[in-house]
Amino acid sequence: MTDLKPFLAKAASREPLTRDEARAAFDILMSGQATPSQIGGFLMALRVRGESVDEIVGAVTTMRSKMLTVEAPADAIDIVGTGGDASGTYNISTLAALIVAGAGVPVAKHGNRALSSKSGAADNLSALGVNIDVGPEIISRCIAEASVGFMFAQLHHSAMRHVGPSRVELGTRTIFNLLGPLSNPAGVRRQLLGVFSPQWLVPLAEVMRDLGSECVWVVHGDGLDEITTTGITKVAALEDGKIRTFELSPADFGVSPCVLADIKGGDGVANAAALREVLGGAKNAYRDVSLANAAASLVISGKVETIRDGMKLAAHSLDSGATALALDKLIAVSNDID
C-alpha cells in the first residue's frame, strides 16, 4: 500500500495501529509517498493519543530496514539518550562511552547534533577532533582499533529527510524523537538508553524486548535522559527477556549528590574542554556522573556484575589514561581516510 489515508483515518479515530500497519505506514512516510499535511496529521494523531508499543516496534522495524548499517562486534554496546530533556548538561553519555571503551568493551555510539541542548554527541566529538562524517568501513575500523566508533545519525538514516520539514514545522515532540536511539546502525543488542520522561521507561523496555535486544537499561534521572547524580534515577531493565524496575541513588555509585548546576554544560567547544579536564584528572561532578553511567554500562555489557565493580573499572579506565587513549585513537582513525 502506498496511501497513508487509511492509516491516518485509523489514527485520527484514536484506534491503535497494529505492528504491521505501523510498519507499512512508516514505510510510506519514509519513502516520500506522503504529503507534508498527511505526515503532520499522522504524527500528531499518534502523539495526542499516545504511541503504543506495537506502533513503535513497527516504526523502528521500518527505520532499521532503511538505515545504512555498520559492522561491529556482537558484544558492542551503545550509550544513548533520546534528548529532549532541555537540561543543557555536559555530554555525559559521550564521556561514559569513552570510559567504557577504555575498559575494553566495544562501543558503537549512535548520536546526532543538539536537539534541546547546546551540544549533542556529534557537536561534542567534532569539537574534540573526531571526524564524524565518515562511512561504515571507517567506523568499523574505529571500533576495532579504538574500541569506540561514532555513527552520525543523519548519515545513517537518510530516509528521515522525507519527514524532517514536517517535524520542524510541528515544533513539538513526535514518535521520531524515540526512534533514533532504538535504531542503532550497528545493531547492538545491549544499551544504556536514556529517555526524556519516566512514562516511557517500561514501554521502551518492552519495545527493545520485542525487537530482540539482550540487555537494555532504560533510564530517567531526575529530569535527565541519563543516570543522574542529582537524585534518584528510575530504571526499567530488560534482562534475559524479563523486565524489572528499580531505582538508583548517588549512594549506590559511592558518589556525593550534586545539583544540576554542577553538571550544566555549554556548546560543543565548551563541553569538549570540560571533557578534557576530566581526562586530565579533574575530580568533579562531571566525572562522577559520567563514571556512574559508565558503571551501569559495564554491568549491561556483562563485563562486571555489580555497580560498585563497574565504578572501580570505570575509574581505572579514566585514571590509567585508557579513556584518553581511546579518544586519541578514535580521533586518529576517524581522520585517516586517505
Curated annotation (Swiss-Prot):
It holds the Pfam family Glycos_transf_3. The keyword Magnesium applies. Catalyzes the transfer of the phosphoribosyl group of 5-phosphorylribose-1-pyrophosphate (PRPP) to anthranilate to yield N-(5'-phosphoribosyl)-anthranilate (PRA). It comes from Rhizobium etli (strain CIAT 652). This is Anthranilate phosphoribosyltransferase. Pathway: Amino-acid biosynthesis; L-tryptophan biosynthesis; L-tryptophan from chorismate: step 2/5. Belongs to the anthranilate phosphoribosyltransferase family. SUPFAM superfamilies: Nucleoside phosphorylase/phosphoribosyltransferase catalytic domain (SSF52418), Nucleoside phosphorylase/phosphoribosyltransferase N-terminal domain (SSF47648). GO terms for biological process: L-tryptophan biosynthetic process. Anthranilate 1 binds at residues 81, 112.
